[in-house]
UniProtKB/Swiss-Prot annotation:
Full protein name: Methionine import ATP-binding protein MetN
A single Gene Ontology CC term: plasma membrane
Subunit details: The complex is composed of two ATP-binding proteins (MetN), two transmembrane proteins (MetI) and a solute-binding protein (MetQ).
Organism encoding this protein: Streptococcus pneumoniae serotype 4 (strain ATCC BAA-334 / TIGR4)
GO MF term set: ABC-type D-methionine transporter activity; ATP binding; ATP hydrolysis activity
EC number in record: 7.4.2.11
Binding site for ATP: 42-49
UniProt family annotation: Belongs to the ABC transporter superfamily. Methionine importer (TC 3.A.1.24) family.
Disulphide-bridged cysteine pairs: none
């Protein structure tokens, strides 16, 4: 069983500006297990970046308790000496939207700068830098300056630099926001690869649920400084509870865009009185069941599929359908019950039940 490598308990962060007190984070508790890729999602101003900055005490909380790798580093106040905190911070790497590379130094020199206070010899440092650049796919770019690198390559240098002190945790704060979609996927694939190869715990801060869907195994949703929903990616995507979470997921799955087109179709605009427009969501074993065929066999209910999507989330197939069900009123009622009994979520979008 995995252990919690990050424990944030009842964290508050408040800022005082003249006569105003601003609460950026309010009573947030999050536990992240070793080896997780953990996404924290929210719109601008949700408090997600402020929250992750307390992990290494770049931002001191106003209240709460922080435990990192079994060491309590904050409990109402900082519990470490300055030297202990410096060493603990070496266990936590960070990458950002802006790469923060030194323009007058090569890729190799930028990574080596993170080893400035290391006890390694000059030769050992050089070998380590070469290994890190190879790990992020830049072995042939060691002597290039930032101006000679693409955005994705600059972020790879930043990742190599963040890994220089062998951290157990890597915080990615909107690290793909400035990148094009193709490069974003490449950087996410790299983070996933590092997670698997190094056993690295990755904390992703993002406003895009698509990023969480691509590589995370757990997700927390923040709004106005509060944690409003948390769970496995599979749980959250298959059964979101909060309206904001539902909005994020609709954007990530493309269902909203699809519904605009579906609603213009003749069969939907002029839905017959013996028909229902329904949305079906299913996960795991349910995706293997020939459910719609069974509806006709047992209830004489016809199913016209207008939209379908299936994805693999954290190793589990998750599907979504928009379907017109047609049949006698009693048969439609029986078919709906059969669908729910099969473990499939059903939502009537249009039609009289």
């Amino acid at each position: 069983m995995s252990r919690d490598i990050i424990k944030l308990d009842q964290i508050d962060v408040t800022f005082h500006q003249k006569k105003r007190t601003i609460t950026a984070v309010k009573d947030v508790t999050i536990h992240i297990q070793e080896g997780d890729i953990y996404g924290i999602v929210g719109y601008s101003g949700a408090g997600k970046s402020t929250l992750v900055r307390v992990i290494n005490l770049l931002q001191k909380p106003s209240a709460g308790k922080i435990t990192i790798d079994d060491d309590v580093i904050f409990d109402g106040k900082v519990t470490l000496t300055a030297e202990q905190l410096r060493r603990k911070r070496q266990d936590i790497g960070m990458i950002f939207q802006h790469f923060n590379l030194m323009s007058q130094k090569t890729a190799e020199e930028n990574v080596a700068f993170a080893l400035k206070h290391s006890e390694l010899s000059k030769e050992e440092k050089k070998a380590k830098v070469a290994k890190l650049l190879d790990l992020v796919g830049l072995a042939d770019r060691a002597e290039n300056y930032p101006s000679q690198l693409s955005g994705g390559q600059k972020q790879r240098v930043a990742i190599a630099r963040a890994l220089a002190n062998d951290p157990k945790i890597l915080i990615s704060d909107e690290s793909t926001s400035a990148l094009d979609p193709k490069t974003t996927k490449q950087i996410l694939a790299l983070l996933q690869d590092l997670n698997q190869k190094l056993g690295l715990t990755v904390v992703l801060i993002t406003h895009e649920m698509q990023i969480v869907k691509d590589i995370a195994n757990r997700v927390a949703v923040m709004q106005d400084g509060h944690l409003i929903e948390e769970g496995s990616v599979l749980e959250i995507f298959s059964n979101p509870k909060q309206p904001l979470t539902q909005d994020f997921i609709s954007t990530a799955t493309g269902i909203d865009e699809a519904m605009v087109k579906i609603e213009k179709q003749e069969i939907v605009e002029h839905l017959s009185e013996n028909s229902l427009l329904v949305q079906l969501k299913y996960a795991g074993a349910s995706t293997d069941e020939p459910l719609l065929n069974e509806l006709y066999k047992h209830y004489q209910v016809m199913a016209n599929i207008l939209y379908g999507n299936i994805e693999i989330l954290d190793g589990t197939p998750v599907g979504e359908l928009v379907v017109v069900l047609s049949g006698e009123k009693a048969a439609l009622a029986g078919a709906q019950e059969a669908i729910r009994q099969a473990g499939v979520q059903l939502k009537v979008l249009k039609g009289v039940q």
